[in-house]
């Protein structure tokens, strides 16, 4: 099963999802880090650390972090002691914030931040040992094309880790998530980011995205091996892993 409908931040008929996603993140880039940590109560940092630990067995020297945003996943991956991390995103605004963060913390010697399209990666086959995506694949315009590109640029037996929001199924997390998504995220997102559509898009995009076994089946059909998933915080987020 794939996405049944295309959910875009602004819903403009004359613009692609990719264009609207880039515009949205440019609009909220200055407040993104604060809002991300505030709205998740800082739990997103714990989720990234858990995802990074799943790459320890690979001992990656080259890591690609797609939809890198301001680079939080790339920074978390420094724990693996790689020689090179490439963070790629389509939003210049997010990348600028990320570059400033890397320079300020002295990470710019290992982590490079590049503008690029996750569905048309400018890398040769089998280049990276590992690949990460944090809260980004649901923003792909063509999900399967993006997932195929991810597999292409990772070496044989390399590992791909995808961290993405999902929809809790059990009480009371299901009810908490529904309230948080419908009222808390749009309320604070609008007032702090000044972009009303951006944080209304978040729960809408999560609702439209295939998750759990549906997403695993897509990965397996595209050639990912040993696909597995792990629920976080009662199903608010999920870590998916696969091997090339």
Where are the language model's segments positioned?
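N-terminal auxiliary segments of SAM/dcSAM-dependent transferases
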Residues: 1-22
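Conserved alpha-helix/loop element of class I SAM-dependent methyltransferases that forms part
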Residues: 31-34, 41-61, 76
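Class I SAM-dependent methyltransferase SAM/SAH-binding core
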Residues: 62-120
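Hydrophobic beta-strand segment of the Class I
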Residues: 32, 131-132
């Amino acid at each position: 099963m794939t996405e049944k409908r295309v959910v875009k931040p602004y819903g403009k008929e004359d613009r692609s999802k990719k264009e609207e996603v880039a515009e949205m993140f440019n609009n909220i880039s200055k407040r993104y880090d604060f809002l991300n940590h505030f709205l998740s109560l800082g739990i997103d940092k714990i989720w990234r650390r858990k995802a990074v630990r799943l790459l320890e067995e690979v001992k990656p020297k080259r890591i690609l972090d797609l939809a890198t945003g301001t680079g939080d996943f790339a920074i978390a991956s420094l724990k693996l002691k790689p020689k090179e991390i490439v963070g790629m995103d389509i939003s210049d605004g997010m990348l600028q914030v990320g570059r400033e963060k890397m320079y300020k913390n002295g990470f710019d010697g290992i982590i490079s931040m590049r503008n690029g399209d996750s569905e048309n990666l400018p890398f040769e086959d089998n280049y990276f040992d590992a690949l990460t995506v944090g809260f980004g694949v649901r923003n792909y315009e063509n999900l399967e094309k993006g997932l195929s590109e991810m597999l292409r640029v990772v070496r044989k037996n390399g590992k791909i880790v995808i961290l993405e929001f999902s929809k809790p199924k059990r009480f009371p997390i299901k009810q908490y998530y529904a309230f948080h998504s419908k009222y808390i995220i749009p309320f604070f997102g609008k007032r702090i980011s000044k972009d009303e559509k951006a944080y209304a898009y978040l729960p809408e995009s999560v609702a439209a995205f295939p998750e759990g076994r549906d997403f695993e089946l897509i990965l397996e059909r595209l050639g990912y091996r040993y696909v597995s998933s792990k629920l976080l915080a009662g199903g608010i987020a999920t870590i998916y892993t696969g091997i090339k």
